[in-house]
Amino acid sequence: MLQEFKTFIAKGNVMDMAVGIIIGAAFTAIVKSLVDDLINPIIGLFTGGVDFTNNFVVLGGDGTAYASLAAAREAGASVFAYGAFFMAVFNFLIIAWVVFMLVKAVNRAKEAAAKEEAAAEPAAPAGPSELDVLLEIRDSLKR
């Protein structure tokens, strides 16, 4: 059973998936930094410094106003954190767009390589048609 597991792990697909997950995690950190450190400050500049991740609504409760989402959560209030959700969706859309562009570039490169390969291969000479072969057989049988 251990040998089967080693064989399974050593297969290319499993290794490719592991590398993809590791690179994906690192890529997610880069995109999160892009959004948090570069895009959000620019958006904040146009919206008067509003931090969207801090937008929330307290559900129920005693009417206490909290200064931040962290303070509300720390106090144990039930919150609807719509700002954090919207920022997560925004991060996802940026990641999806970048991945789409990468896949598109890879597909174009593969298509270009396939076209070059097809152009480099000379066309195989056409062999005799079925009719030609049958005529040859007929002629040999006549002799």
UniProtKB/Swiss-Prot annotation:
InterPro entries, A to Z: Mechanosensitive_channel_CS, MS_channel, MSC/AndL, MscL_channel
Pfam family, one: MscL
Gene Ontology cellular component list: plasma membrane
Residues that span the membrane, as ranges: 14-34, 83-103
Single GO term (MF): mechanosensitive monoatomic ion channel activity
Source organism superkingdom: Bacteria
Cell compartments where the protein resides: Cell inner membrane
Keyword vocabulary terms for this entry: Cell inner membrane, Cell membrane, Ion channel, Ion transport, Membrane, Transmembrane, Transmembrane helix, Transport
Family: Belongs to the MscL family.
Protein purpose: Channel that opens in response to stretch forces in the membrane lipid bilayer. May participate in the regulation of osmotic pressure changes within the cell.
Subunit note: Homopentamer.
PANTHER family for the chain: LARGE-CONDUCTANCE MECHANOSENSITIVE CHANNEL, MECHANOSENSITIVE CHANNEL MSCL
Official protein name in the record: Large-conductance mechanosensitive channel
Native organism: Ruegeria pomeroyi (strain ATCC 700808 / DSM 15171 / DSS-3) (Silicibacter pomeroyi)
Organismal lineage: Bacteria, Pseudomonadati, Pseudomonadota, Alphaproteobacteria, Rhodobacterales
Underlying gene: mscL
